[in-house]
Amino acid sequence: VISVLLSMILGTFLGIIMTSQSKIVRLLTRFYLEFIRIMPQLVLLFIVYFGLARNFNINISGESSAIIVFTLWGTAEMGDLVRGAITSLPKHQFESGQALGLTKSQLYYYVIIPQVLRRLLPQAINLITRMIKTTSLVVLIGVVEVTKVGQQIIDSNRLTIPTASFWIYGTILVLYFLVCFPISKLAGHLEKHWSN
């Protein structure tokens, strides 16, 4: 939840910055985006959790590592979504607002942001769903979450209930489905509603 909120806020600012006219700013933000996209989240988790602890003598918990990594990843993805939504607007939208005498803040508030939100919201909700599903990776750095709890239940019942893994992982699948499906349906509904 913390990573999702931070990613949405920081990603919005990053996306706006990515539309800058400065080549240096665009180059730096593009490098950040591509670096984070190329690196698997699991590798980033290991780098933050094990690398920071060993190389910089920083004692960082698994939960903090997960928040850092998922915020970095979510910010990069959200930034690219915001950039894409802004740059997909026809140039005449900006020019028309300026021709009407709107200030830059009025132009964004009344013209640009409402259109960007229509294009962005379904994609942002899709990103939230992806982030939720990817959280299962944190079990590999010792964070206790639903997959880890499931594994502990399976381990403790392995001898008495041989089919425990089927039932536990099936339950975990249903839990992820119950969380992600409504979010996914909301994205589809908003996309359909705003496409008119």
Residue spans for each PLM region:
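Transmembrane alpha-helices and adjacent helix-loop boundaries
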Residues: V1-N196
